Amino acid sequence: MKPNRILPLVLVLACSIAVARGTYQEPEDFLADTFGTEPPSPGVVWLRGETRETSKAILGHKYPSLRIRYWGNAERSAWILEEIGKEQPITVGLVVSNGRIERIKVLAFRESRGWEVRHPFFTDQFRDIGLTGERGLDRDIDGISGATLSVRALKKLARLALYLHTRIPATDDTP
Protein backbone atom coordinates (compact mmCIF):
# COMPACT_ATOMS: atom_id res chain seq x y z
CA MET A 1 0.00 0.00 0.00
CA LYS A 2 1.30 3.45 -0.85
CA PRO A 3 2.09 5.87 2.00
CA ASN A 4 -0.47 8.40 0.71
CA ARG A 5 -3.21 5.77 1.18
CA ILE A 6 -2.10 4.80 4.66
CA LEU A 7 -2.15 8.33 6.08
CA PRO A 8 -5.96 8.81 5.82
CA LEU A 9 -6.50 5.42 7.44
CA VAL A 10 -4.17 6.31 10.31
CA LEU A 11 -5.93 9.66 10.78
CA VAL A 12 -9.37 8.05 10.91
CA LEU A 13 -8.14 5.51 13.46
CA ALA A 14 -6.51 8.19 15.61
CA CYS A 15 -9.69 10.29 15.55
CA SER A 16 -11.87 7.35 16.60
CA ILE A 17 -9.60 6.68 19.59
CA ALA A 18 -9.66 10.36 20.56
CA VAL A 19 -13.48 10.42 20.38
CA ALA A 20 -13.69 7.41 22.72
CA ARG A 21 -11.78 9.28 25.43
CA GLY A 22 -13.39 12.25 27.05
CA THR A 23 -15.77 13.77 29.52
CA TYR A 24 -19.38 12.99 28.67
CA GLN A 25 -21.02 14.80 31.57
CA GLU A 26 -19.68 16.97 34.38
CA PRO A 27 -20.41 15.72 37.91
CA GLU A 28 -22.41 18.89 38.68
CA ASP A 29 -24.65 18.24 35.67
CA PHE A 30 -25.13 14.61 36.70
CA LEU A 31 -26.24 15.74 40.17
CA ALA A 32 -28.56 18.38 38.68
CA ASP A 33 -30.14 15.72 36.42
CA THR A 34 -30.58 13.46 39.44
CA PHE A 35 -31.95 15.93 41.99
CA GLY A 36 -33.16 18.89 39.97
CA THR A 37 -31.66 22.34 39.98
CA GLU A 38 -30.45 22.27 43.59
CA PRO A 39 -28.75 19.02 44.67
CA PRO A 40 -28.65 18.28 48.41
CA SER A 41 -25.55 19.05 50.43
CA PRO A 42 -23.01 16.24 50.26
CA GLY A 43 -22.58 13.73 53.05
CA VAL A 44 -19.56 11.57 53.75
CA VAL A 45 -19.04 7.85 54.36
CA TRP A 46 -15.73 7.25 56.12
CA LEU A 47 -13.74 4.20 55.07
CA ARG A 48 -12.78 2.81 58.46
CA GLY A 49 -12.96 -0.62 60.03
CA GLU A 50 -15.50 -2.95 58.44
CA THR A 51 -16.48 -0.38 55.81
CA ARG A 52 -12.88 -0.09 54.65
CA GLU A 53 -12.35 -3.87 54.60
CA THR A 54 -15.58 -4.53 52.70
CA SER A 55 -14.80 -1.79 50.18
CA LYS A 56 -11.36 -3.30 49.69
CA ALA A 57 -12.89 -6.76 49.15
CA ILE A 58 -15.34 -5.37 46.58
CA LEU A 59 -12.70 -3.46 44.60
CA GLY A 60 -9.80 -5.85 45.07
CA HIS A 61 -7.69 -2.94 46.42
CA LYS A 62 -7.99 -0.05 48.86
CA TYR A 63 -10.03 2.92 47.72
CA PRO A 64 -7.62 5.85 47.18
CA SER A 65 -9.21 8.10 49.82
CA LEU A 66 -10.40 7.74 53.41
CA ARG A 67 -13.86 9.13 52.74
CA ILE A 68 -16.36 9.06 49.93
CA ARG A 69 -18.89 11.82 49.30
CA TYR A 70 -22.50 11.16 48.45
CA TRP A 71 -25.55 13.29 47.87
CA GLY A 72 -28.97 12.30 49.20
CA ASN A 73 -30.12 10.22 52.14
CA ALA A 74 -30.62 6.61 53.28
CA GLU A 75 -33.48 6.14 50.80
CA ARG A 76 -31.92 7.67 47.68
CA SER A 77 -28.29 8.60 47.14
CA ALA A 78 -25.97 9.64 44.33
CA TRP A 79 -22.29 8.70 44.16
CA ILE A 80 -19.47 9.82 41.89
CA LEU A 81 -16.80 7.13 41.97
CA GLU A 82 -13.70 6.21 40.01
CA GLU A 83 -12.10 2.90 39.19
CA ILE A 84 -9.22 1.97 36.91
CA GLY A 85 -10.23 0.22 33.70
CA LYS A 86 -7.00 -1.08 32.22
CA GLU A 87 -4.65 1.81 32.98
CA GLN A 88 -6.75 4.96 33.45
CA PRO A 89 -9.64 5.87 35.76
CA ILE A 90 -13.25 5.72 34.65
CA THR A 91 -15.48 8.25 36.42
CA VAL A 92 -19.01 6.99 36.99
CA GLY A 93 -22.13 8.56 38.47
CA LEU A 94 -24.47 6.13 40.23
CA VAL A 95 -27.88 6.65 41.82
CA VAL A 96 -29.09 4.14 44.41
CA SER A 97 -32.73 4.13 45.47
CA ASN A 98 -33.97 1.84 48.25
CA GLY A 99 -31.01 -0.49 47.84
CA ARG A 100 -31.27 -0.83 44.05
CA ILE A 101 -29.41 0.89 41.22
CA GLU A 102 -31.66 3.52 39.71
CA ARG A 103 -29.16 4.90 37.24
CA ILE A 104 -25.52 4.52 36.23
CA LYS A 105 -23.72 6.83 33.85
CA VAL A 106 -20.12 7.02 32.67
CA LEU A 107 -19.12 10.64 33.23
CA ALA A 108 -15.51 10.46 31.99
CA PHE A 109 -13.62 7.74 30.15
CA ARG A 110 -9.86 7.98 29.67
CA GLU A 111 -8.94 4.61 28.14
CA SER A 112 -8.30 3.91 24.47
CA ARG A 113 -10.47 0.76 24.55
CA GLY A 114 -13.65 -0.31 26.26
CA TRP A 115 -15.53 2.97 25.75
CA GLU A 116 -18.66 1.06 24.76
CA VAL A 117 -19.54 0.80 28.46
CA ARG A 118 -20.78 4.39 28.34
CA HIS A 119 -23.71 3.58 26.06
CA PRO A 120 -27.25 2.95 27.37
CA PHE A 121 -27.36 -0.52 25.77
CA PHE A 122 -24.80 -1.50 28.40
CA THR A 123 -25.61 0.73 31.39
CA ASP A 124 -29.35 -0.07 31.25
CA GLN A 125 -28.50 -3.59 32.43
CA PHE A 126 -27.72 -2.16 35.87
CA ARG A 127 -31.17 -0.65 36.37
CA ASP A 128 -32.94 -2.13 39.43
CA ILE A 129 -30.00 -4.36 40.32
CA GLY A 130 -29.12 -4.97 43.97
CA LEU A 131 -26.62 -6.84 46.13
CA THR A 132 -26.71 -10.46 47.20
CA GLY A 133 -25.86 -11.47 50.75
CA GLU A 134 -22.25 -12.01 49.61
CA ARG A 135 -22.16 -8.46 48.21
CA GLY A 136 -22.26 -9.57 44.59
CA LEU A 137 -24.74 -8.24 42.04
CA ASP A 138 -28.07 -10.07 42.17
CA ARG A 139 -28.29 -10.29 38.39
CA ASP A 140 -25.75 -11.08 35.68
CA ILE A 141 -24.36 -8.29 33.52
CA ASP A 142 -23.56 -9.15 29.91
CA GLY A 143 -20.00 -8.25 28.96
CA ILE A 144 -18.73 -6.49 25.87
CA SER A 145 -16.09 -8.16 23.74
CA GLY A 146 -12.90 -6.13 23.96
CA ALA A 147 -14.11 -4.15 26.99
CA THR A 148 -13.68 -6.74 29.74
CA LEU A 149 -11.71 -4.50 32.11
CA SER A 150 -14.09 -1.57 31.66
CA VAL A 151 -17.08 -3.85 32.28
CA ARG A 152 -15.39 -5.22 35.39
CA ALA A 153 -14.71 -1.67 36.64
CA LEU A 154 -18.37 -0.64 36.29
CA LYS A 155 -19.55 -3.81 38.02
CA LYS A 156 -17.19 -3.11 40.94
CA LEU A 157 -18.41 0.47 41.22
CA ALA A 158 -22.05 -0.64 41.16
CA ARG A 159 -21.34 -3.08 44.00
CA LEU A 160 -19.43 -0.41 45.92
CA ALA A 161 -22.20 2.20 45.58
CA LEU A 162 -24.83 -0.33 46.67
CA TYR A 163 -22.73 -1.29 49.69
CA LEU A 164 -21.89 2.31 50.64
CA HIS A 165 -25.58 3.21 50.40
CA THR A 166 -26.18 0.81 53.31
CA ARG A 167 -23.60 2.74 55.34
CA ILE A 168 -25.52 6.05 55.18
CA PRO A 169 -26.94 6.79 58.62
CA ALA A 170 -30.73 6.39 58.71
CA THR A 171 -30.96 9.63 60.69
CA ASP A 172 -29.46 11.63 57.83
CA ASP A 173 -32.34 13.87 56.78
CA THR A 174 -30.70 15.45 53.76
CA PRO A 175 -33.47 15.99 51.14
Annotate each language-model stretch with its function:
Residues 1-7:
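Bacterial N-terminal signal peptides that target proteins for export
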Residues 8-16:
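Bacterial N-terminal signal peptides
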Residues 19-148, 152, 156-175:
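Flexible, solvent-exposed loop/hinge segments and secondary-structure transition points
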